[in-house]
Regions:
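Active-site histidine-anchored catalytic micro-motif
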Residues: 2-346
Length: 346
């Protein structure tokens, strides 16, 4: 019998719709388990235990939610479970998947995030399909680590938690940074994707040490920016932030001319208030940079490489908040497969 811990946090997968408004009411997060038991009787022998550290629509996610979720997970002996499923809202799924991928990398069982495009009671919802995929992965993969299960583009995709990219706003489909999902579930089995960009199953079975104490306090803020044409940095105040992650264009470029439109002007503001400024995501395999970036990097702007902006942002949140952590060194390490095509740093 498989013993699976289900961690309910709300989101669309834990909501109901009333008069055209989706929300979390009473026991609505528990509807998922009742419907799964009804629709998937072949998994009746699974023993589900449930905890509910908080219930929110995930657009309301804050650092405090991450502190609560990690506190709940770090207090669990993961070796006593076949797996853990965390239900979450789809809006910020990529962020929580990534940060818990880092924090729970030493788990002794598979931890699988999942979500839904519509409430469980909607006939068009993929909630049961996604939850079932998470169960099938736990039972059949033989792996440990942190993952995300979500059906996208007609595939029951399994993602490495630190490589999940936010969903397309129109289709509600998720993708993987680097373009390769980790695998899929099909007919009740896990089918790995043997891409050279993915870690091997032996790598996933390595014993990894935890990077954090049992409790975390995320008191230092990190800002996330995205470059766009005519971005006016004079309107942005980095005061009070430990760091700023500036996601450049796809070549990791950002404007370096035009006064307040230049990232160089913002770098001066960041330096004046003690906020570290990061630009990326660079490709570490490339030895050449554009002239615009060469000028920016000579100003002392830091660079992050080979990872999504969700992974970079959440990594920075930990880099600037975990005790006894050198932020620069932490950002360059490959903590939990977030850096595509690179081996783990330890």
């Amino acid at each position: 019998m498989s013993k699976i811990l289900v961690v309910l946090t709300g989101g669309t997968i834990g909501s109901v719709c009333s008069d055209g408004v989706r929300g979390i009411n009473g026991d609505s997060p528990y509807i998922l388990l009742r419907e799964f038991s009804r629709r998937c009787p072949e998994y009746s022998e699974c023993n589900f235990e449930v905890i509910n550290p908080y219930s929110i629509l995930s657009e309301n996610l804050s650092y405090g939610c991450w502190e609560k979720l990690y506190s709940a997970l770090s207090g669990i002996d993961t070796s006593t479970y076949s797996g853990i499923i965390i239900t979450h809202g789809s809006d910020t799924l990529a962020y929580t998947s990534a940060i818990m991928g880092y924090l729970m990398r030493g788990t002794q069982c598979p931890i699988v995030f999942t979500a839904a495009d519509r409430p469980v009671d909607d006939p068009e919802s993929n909630a049961i399909c996604n939850f079932r995929s998470a169960v099938e992965f736990i039972i059949n993969s033989g792996l440990r680590g942190v993952f995300t299960a979500y059906r996208s583009y007609s595939v029951n995709a399994i993602h490495l938690a630190t490589r999940l990219c936010s969903a397309d706003c129109f289709l509600d489909e998720f993708t993987a940074y680097g373009g390769e999902i980790f695998g899929k579930t099909d007919k009740g089995r896990f089918v790995p994707n043997a891409s050279p960009l993915n870690p091997s199953q032996s790598e996933l079975k390595r014993d990894l040490t935890s990077i954090a104490p049992d409790k975390i306090h995320l008191s230092r803020k990190v800002m996330l920016l995205h470059s766009y044409p005519h971005m006016d940095y004079s309107a942005i105040n980095p005061d009070g932030f430990a760091a700023v992650i500036n996601c450049g264009y796809h070549c990791a470029t950002a404007c370096n001319s035009g006064g307040s439109l230049s990232l160089a002007s913002f770098a001066e503001k960041c330096a004046a208030c003690g906020a570290d400024l990061w630009l990326g995501s660079f490709k570490s395999a490339e030895n050449e940079v554009y002239a615009s970036n060469d000028a920016l990097l000579k100003l002392g702007i830091r660079q992050f490489t080979d990872m999504s902006w969700e992974a970079a942002y959440t990594k920075a949140v930990l880099a600037y908040n975990l005790p006894n952590t050198d932020a620069d060194e932490f950002m360059q390490r490959n903590i939990y497969f977030e850096q595509v095509g690179k081996p783990l740093s330890d």
